[in-house]
Amino acid sequence: PATQVITDEMARAAANVTGANRLLIGLGWSLVILIYWLKRREKLDLRGEMNLEISMLIIATAIMGLIVVFQQVSIILAVVLIGVYLAYLWISSTGESEEPELIGVALVIGSLPVARRRATVVLMFLYAAAVILLAAEPFVHGLVETGAEFGIDEFILIQWIAPLASESPEIIIAVLFTLRSNPQAGLTTLVSSEVNQLTLLVGSITVVFSISAGEVMSFPLDDRQSIEFLLTAAVSAFAIILIAPRVLGARVGLVLLGLFIVHLFFSDPGQRLIFSYIYFGLAIFLIVVDRGRIRQLIPRRL
């Protein structure tokens, strides 16, 4: 990877994916936990919930470690990540599920005949994809120019502003679930999104990169991007260990939110590396003081 040129566009892709993942955990997870505690003044009990999502997140986090070691998202790892995502879809679709309570637009669409309902959903996906394709490039160029005007590092700008725009709908939905006394669905939504990001999104980067290059290639990372992937893996590992008991009080939410906010003020790669060690150190500390957390991560059933 060191011999390959890392273009601005490649750096932006790495910035976006790492920022999105840390935003979901640091802001999304913490908001659900804290809002529930403020509303009910009790801990969020998720025992027996999210077994599949947590298991897949553990696998994806471990693969993030391999990406850092090899300093690239190799085509092999990309295929593995996409395979993990497809396995997640298959297992979740064949498992037990509850019929959702539809309201508003969802209720209207759900009431349509099967053929019309499927056609409507497909058209909505196509419309959303078209909007993203038309808006993404001007949006990124606007961010870069704004950053240059105010002297803001474009890597940091792309890492946080772009994910804030793309991930805010999921976070808002999770918050609405929580306000409607369904925090389990809210947090499951965000953990599932985290799995999607670390598997399908990261794997797709290499696939798209290979298509644009006209040959099968790995997606290289420079030192800064490798550190960002390491920090993302560290945040994910710590969060997994932290929520392992599945009984989450305000302290858990405050820790996730506090660490997330503090690390935003340190953008230097060396400082980010230190934060990676801090997150890993905290994860190890939690395991040492409560070894049962590892056992609690082993699902009895998916």
Where do the language-model regions lie?
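Hydrophobic alpha-helical segments, chiefly the membrane-spanning helices
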Residues: 1-302
